[in-house]
């Protein structure tokens, strides 16, 4: 009958000598294991704005909004921490070598204001030079160019995007028939969406004298 009490006394003496078994949080910060899956965080420099993370998120914790402004077209990508389940699918699906968004070791995620739980980044959009529709983020186009290499020169949208990033494209180039509200075949050498690319390829406007 006394044996259990003796064991308790032995454990109490060990605790006095060696210290408590529990962690000293919150007096001392906790360092999680390196493989701990904490809050995902965007890397604005690595992210290309493709939206792949949004497509694979099982709880729709990632969303984006395209702001089609001619002066400052941009894509606002938002991660909702309060909805996230930290599954890691966004990191696994990232086309930028899984560097655009990564799980961190941040685990203490208490907020008094729910809006502060959201993380946002902005990526510059590339618009069609005729209809101003969204084509993709410029970083995404540059990523595609890097993957295709010299094959990208078969696509005017890609190689003109590359030349524009190098600062050697004249921004003042306009269609010779722009005042007539139509597209000319010369517009093929522009950054265009798929619909305008088709129209400028199939149009016969301005070619009757050839």
PLM regions and their residue ranges:
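Non-ligating segments of multi-cofactor redox enzymes
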Residues: 1-68, 72, 81-83, 89-92, ...
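Phosphate/diphosphate ligand-binding glycine-rich loop within oxidoreductases
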Residues: 75
């Amino acid at each position: 009958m006394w044996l259990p009490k003796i064991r308790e006394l032995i454990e109490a003496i060990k605790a006095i000598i060696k210290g408590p078994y529990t962690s000293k949080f919150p007096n001392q910060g906790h360092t999680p294991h390196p493989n701990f899956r904490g809050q995902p965080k965007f890397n604005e420099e690595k992210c290309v704005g493709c939206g792949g993370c949004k497509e694979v998120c099982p709880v729709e914790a990632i969303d984006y909004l395209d702001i089609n402004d001619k002066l400052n077209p941009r894509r606002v990508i938002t991660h909702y921490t309060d909805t996230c389940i930290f599954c890691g699918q966004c990191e696994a699906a990232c086309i930028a070598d899984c560097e655009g968004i990564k799980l961190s070791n941040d685990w203490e995620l208490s907020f008094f204001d729910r809006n502060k739980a959201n993380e946002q980044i902005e990526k510059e959009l590339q618009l069609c030079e005729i209809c101003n529709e969204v084509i993709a983020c410029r970083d995404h186009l540059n990523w595609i160019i890097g993957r295709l290499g010299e094959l990208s020169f078969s696509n005017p949208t890609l190689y003109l995007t590359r030349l524009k990033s190098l600062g050697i494209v004249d921004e003042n180039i306009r269609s010779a028939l722009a005042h007539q509200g139509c597209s000319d075949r010369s517009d093929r050498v522009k950054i265009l969406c798929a619909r305008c690319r088709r129209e400028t390829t199939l149009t016969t406007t301005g070619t009757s004298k050839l």
